[in-house]
Amino acid sequence: MEKTLKGIVLNSFDFRDYDKIITIYSNLYGKISLVCLGVNKTKSKNKYAINYLSYSNFEIFKAKNKLGLSKLKRSELINSFSHIATDFNLYVYANVLTSLVMNLEDHMKNYNLFKILKLSIFLINSKPNISFKVCILFMFYFLKIIGNQINLTVCGFCNSKINPIIAISFTNYCSSCKFCYFDDCLIIDNQLKNFINSIVKDDFIASLNQKISNQNLKILTKFVLSYYKDQVGIFTTSMYLLSTINQFK
């Protein structure tokens, strides 16, 4: 059956001489793979809309079952987010997002995730000055999607909601109040505490408007990357690059 949808290209690879298989995250079906016949031909009208990170309209022949591959009929490019490809750091930030979404099961639909992914890539492309913050916020937001949200607003040792948080533990992946503080905890300032509270309690856009220093973002980067690696079991190539590029040393 024919369907029209919007989607962001997460991945693509050549399939036979002139064909590709792409994976997109769409507004209707979540993550879905499409076989794109003839798109590697010079005269193909579909070749620009299926490049990595492209946000496009897709007309498809939907597979009858979840095990089958849907087929691309026609595509129309909406935004290529081309500036991302000109800067290594921006490319890493965007690839962290898409590599996380690629870990989802096919046909797992979440319209809020679709909106946040589209917004995040748009901001990384158009507002490089906040791209680092966008990437880290998305990583925390994605933890909510997969059921691994971290609540850093209460002490992870005594569960007190009264004792003020003063530090975070990179060993236990939790916050610590002044009565439970250990030597392996890192003391945090009020700005970082407020930002953490916003991540837990507010939506993505509200958290994006919270002020945070680059140094505090570096702390959160180290924390969330370690959490993904040790507790979630996800650590992609782009996440490794995020941990090693000079900005985060």
Curated annotation (Swiss-Prot):
Protein name: DNA repair protein RecO
Gene3D superfamilies found in the cross-reference section: Nucleic acid-binding proteins
Family note: Belongs to the RecO family.
GO CC annotation terms, alphabetical: bacterial nucleoid
InterPro entries per UniProt: ARFGAP/RecO, DNA_rep/recomb_RecO_N, NA-bd_OB-fold, RecO
The keyword DNA damage appears for this protein: yes
Species of origin: Mycoplasma capricolum subsp. capricolum (strain California kid / ATCC 27343 / NCTC 10154)
Keywords assigned: DNA damage, DNA recombination, DNA repair
Signal peptide, first to last residue: none
Any Pfam family: RecO_N
One of the GO biological process terms: double-strand break repair
NCBIfam families: reco
Function: Involved in DNA repair and RecF pathway recombination.
UniProt keyword Cell membrane present: no
